[in-house]
Curated annotation (Swiss-Prot):
Residues 212-247 form the UVR domain. Its main location: cytoplasm. It comes from Helicobacter hepaticus (strain ATCC 51449 / 3B1). This is UvrABC system protein C. Interacts with UvrB in an incision complex. Residues 20-106 form the GIY-YIG domain. GO terms for cellular component: cytoplasm; excinuclease repair complex. Belongs to the UvrC family. The lineage of its organism: Bacteria, Pseudomonadati, Campylobacterota, Epsilonproteobacteria, Campylobacterales. GO terms for molecular function: DNA binding; excinuclease ABC activity.
């Protein structure tokens, strides 16, 4: 009996003896890679819903989607684990999906914890600060959650109001540089009363709650900076204005009050608009849009959405909503809703999930499926927003089709929805740095960009150092579907060796300039680049959409790496100039901690510099 026949026989024996109790099941392939984790009230019935037995061979059921049928065809081992009840199965399923990240489970793996602005009113001179956790004090006032713009909002408060700029300022006995530039009222020297400072705090709260008033202040400041030819500062202010303007916290629900989190999941079929190359594949792929509205005191303070690429037939609605809610509420949230609103549909495990969330959040929140009234209107509002996201996402389907085409061209195991791109930059072996950019869901995710100071001299060793450091962080920052390198065959083999050493399943591609007469040549608009995979080389035409897409990623990481290289070089030049003025390394660091940049330091008077250097070090608390 061959190994394949033996595996099939063992699987048949196992199927005949499956338990009928509740629990979780796991599917593994011939390399013992976990494919899927699921829960079931009756394990035997659920597992057999995937499989048929024909001529003593296991085949996928006819009603399965192509993607799930492909998964079933890869199953060589099934593992089950019994639980006392369905609720325990639900807990265990979610835990295993989060920790093991099975290939075919829905991609709700990114842990999103939204920031809040808070103020501790038990302090005589409180400060506005950011948190993502519940703080242990009943004197804390929270504002949020903010899906984006929280940092810009906070910075705007400190730039425009005389607030205590650092925690250490209150404990000091002498006014610091912030008081000299009129940004701190100097409570350390009793130059402001608690009552007067409380009025400033009230102004800050008013600006948080009235973005229009804050934006008027910022726009006036931007125009003043521009008029004074301070264009860099004006550009920073412009970006801040744009970020705060985008914060979706202006809408009011006039017909109701209360605290609600609204979740609406909507399917989108992406297969209809695909390129011819995609039509050749027999998989009908879909995108789910998970739309979320966060409502506090009847006000929509923020909203967000997640694009979930998967096959609609592989998960039913209860599974999808269960995973979405467990993922969202798995960490403590400062301002919990009274109710979670989801659309009406048959949800047998609703009470189990509600009880689990109550235990998880230590609250009495309810999951409600409203059929009519104001709460139903909130669901319709979320649905309307999801439709708009669908419209925008449909416009981006060319990128999706390009990803599918790249997958098929390079024979990748999955569509590379998440891509990390790497490049190094140096000048004659000095200021050696590397950059990693991240592309997900049709966009560059700048919050996930990473810069690396490299300590090796040649480009090959620098790439090795950077990739190894990234791979060693997979536990805290999960790997993408694809690595794209600026290089060739040597870089691909290097990356594959590193990935193998950490046991990560990541595809690797490389793109490099074609060489003419031993020199890399690339003319604008006529780029001669070679794309390489593990086993093949592709010389695509300059107008090929796949090549242009990968070039866009390569150019972005090149820009990011060289910008960091120039920054390091300029910083060293400025540091050398300061050293030439007989300041020590420690003094330069101390000055930069206070002034924030060399540019600000240049404009400081000698008296201000001497004042900073004469102060004893105090660490923030």
């Amino acid at each position: 009996m061959s190994n394949k026949e033996s595996t099939s026989y063992n699987l048949l024996v196992h199927l005949a003896d499956l338990p009928t109790q509740s629990g979780i099941y796991q599917f593994f392939d011939n390399e013992d890679t976990l494919l899927y984790v699921g829960k079931a009230k009756n394990l035997k019935n659920r597992i057999k819903s995937y499989l048929s037995i024909e001529n003593k061979h296991i085949v996928p059921k006819n009603n399965l989607s192509p993607r799930i049928a492909l998964m079933v065809s890869q199953i060589t081992r099934i593992h089950t684990l019994l639980t006392n009840n369905e609720q325990d199965a639900l807990i265990l399923e979610n835990s295993l999906i989060k920790s093991l990240k099975p290939k075919y489970n829905i991609l709700l793996r990114d842990d999103k914890t939204y920031p809040y602005i808070y103020i501790d009113k038990s302090l005589p001179y409180p400060r506005f600060e950011l948190t993502r956790q519940v703080l242990k004090s009943n004197q804390i006032q929270y504002f949020g959650p903010f899906v984006s713009g929280a940092r810009e909002l906070l910075d705007s408060l400190y730039d425009n109001l005389p607030l205590v700029q650092k925690k250490s300022c209150v404990k000091g006995k002498k006014a610091c540089i912030f008081h000299q530039i009129h940004k701190c009222p100097a409570p350390c020297e009793n130059k402001v009363s608690i009552q007067t400072y409380a009025q400033t705090i009230a102004q800050g709260i008013a600006l948080i709650e009235d973005k229009k008033a804050l934006l008027k202040i910022l726009e006036s400041k931007m125009h003043t900076l521009s008029h004074n030819l301070q264009f860099e500062e004006a550009a920073i202010m412009r970006d801040r204005i744009q970020k705060i303007t985008q914060m979706k916290n202006q809408s009011i629900i006039d017909m109701m009050s209360g605290d609600y989190d609204v979740f609406v999941l909507q399917e989108q079929d992406c297969g209809k608009n695909s390129q011819d190359s995609h039509k050749k594949s027999h998989t009908a792929l879909h995108t789910h849009i998970l739309m979320m509205l966060f409502i506090r005191n009847g006000r929509i303070i923020s909203s967000d959405f997640i694009l979930l690429h998967d096959d609609i037939q592989s998960h039913n609605l209860p599974q999808l909503y269960t995973q979405a809610l467990l993922n969202h509420y798995k960490t403590q949230i400062p301002l919990l809703p009274q109710e979670i609103l989801i659309p009406p549909f048959d949800f047998p495990d609703l009470l189990h999930l509600q009880q689990l969330l109550r235990e998880q959040t230590r609250s009495s929140l309810k999951i409600v499926q409203p059929q009519r009234g104001a709460k139903k209107d909130l669901l319709q509002l979320a649905h309307k927003n999801a439709l708009e996201i669908r419209r925008l996402h449909t416009q981006q389907n060319n990128t999706f089709s390009t990803l599918v085409s790249i997958k098929e061209l390079c024979v990748l195991s999955q569509i590379p929805y998440s891509i990390e791109v790497f490049d190094t930059s140096h000048h004659s072996g000095t200021h050696n740095v590397g950059g990693m950019i991240v592309y997900e869901n049709d966009d560059f995710i700048r919050s996930k960009y990473r810069r690396y100071e490299l300590h090796t001299s040649d480009e090959y060793s620098q790439m090795h150092e950077m990739l190894l450091r990234r791979a060693q962080s997979f536990d805290s920052n999960p790997p993408p579907a694809l690595w794209l390198l600026d290089g060739g065959r040597a870089q691909i083999n290097l990356a594959l060796d590193i990935l193998k050493s950490v046991g990560a399943n990541v595809e690797v591609l490389a793109i490099a300039k074609m060489k003419h007469n031993a020199k890399a040549y690339r003319a604008k608009g006529n780029a001669f680049d070679i794309l390489r995979s593990k086993n093949a080389e592709f010389k695509l035409k300059p107008n090929d959409k796949r090549l242009q897409f990968l070039q866009k990623l390569r150019d972005e990481v090149h820009r990011y790496a060289i910008t960091y290289h120039r920054y390091k070089k300029q910083k060293d030049i400025q540091k050398a100039q300061m050293m030439g003025k007989n300041y020590t390394q420690a003094q330069i660091k101390k000055l930069l901690d206070y002034f924030g940049s060399f540019e600000s330091l240049k404009t400081a008077s000698q008296e201000q510099i001497n004042s900073v250097l004469s102060r004893r070090n105090r660490s923030d608390t």
